Amino acid sequence: MTYVRAFEHTSQVLEHNPMGDPHVRQVHVYLPPDYSERRKEPYPVVFMLAGWGGRGATYLADAGAFAQGLPQRLDRMIAARELPPCIVVFPDGSTRLGASQYVNSIANGNHMDYLCDELVDWVDERFHTHKSRDYRGIIGHSSGGFGALVCAMMRSDRFGALTSSAGDSWYEFLYTHTIPQTLEALRAAGGVKSFVDQFLASPNPMGLLGGRAIVAMLNLSMASCFTPNLEVPVIKGDLWFDLETGELIDEHWKRLLAWDPLRMVDRHVSDLRSLRFIQLESGSEDEYGLHLGHRQIAKKLQRHGIPLHIDEYPGKHSGHHHRMPLRIARMVKHLVES
């Protein structure tokens, strides 16, 4: 029987954040069938991170008449012994502008500390876990994949396994090829403030406003994550491109590039080598070039002698959440190996 519980968690590190986002957030937790505090062997834990514009509960949405949802798939795989019993945690890393990218920011608050310290400890206190990073993995798609990559690198004391599904990387392409669309959207709206106001006033901006508006808001939100500046109104961050010409602004561009997982690999070799499992998956036609980012990350890992599982499958950036249970299973099997 599927057992997903919803909790409200009060964060200390997110309280009074300059963006004004809530510090009381919902956390959903999947517990395996027959979960028991008296079980001899504690349960491994997987933290599952949503992409930009989503929350953890996004993964728990009803899959419709012709597909099983994620919790039901996990139940079925556990019953078939295809997946060791495990706990899966779905945190909320969203912000007013879309996403925190799960990093610490003077604008959005310390979301990495929230996830890696507050939530990890909260889960270990509340549930029957190993209370060890060696039995704790992190997985996510898109911005969630980025979050998994950077948390595993920067907080390898907390996570022993990593899965990135089309995680943000190779910023030279990812954060330049949408600059023209962003400028068009901002110009049509009458500037940054007007654009943000119109976007947030829409009852369903992701569905009604179109791709140009979405990539524009995504780029604006990245400034609050990676190039924060509290003196900048509305977005509280410095954009890395000129709003008139689109040319890169060197100072801000360098700050953004420092957060590219592709560049971070060389700074975190020992952290990555300590992980029990690394998995990179993506569609072979990802329109954001993230399959190429993964290939470049894999090449660096291989150069450092760090083992990994990398896979590409037919498809673009979206529409592949049905692969998540298999990724979780592959990760958890490595976590429970002695």
Positions of the model-derived regions?
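Non-catalytic cap/lid and distal C-terminal segments of serine-dependent acyl enzymes
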Residues: 1-338
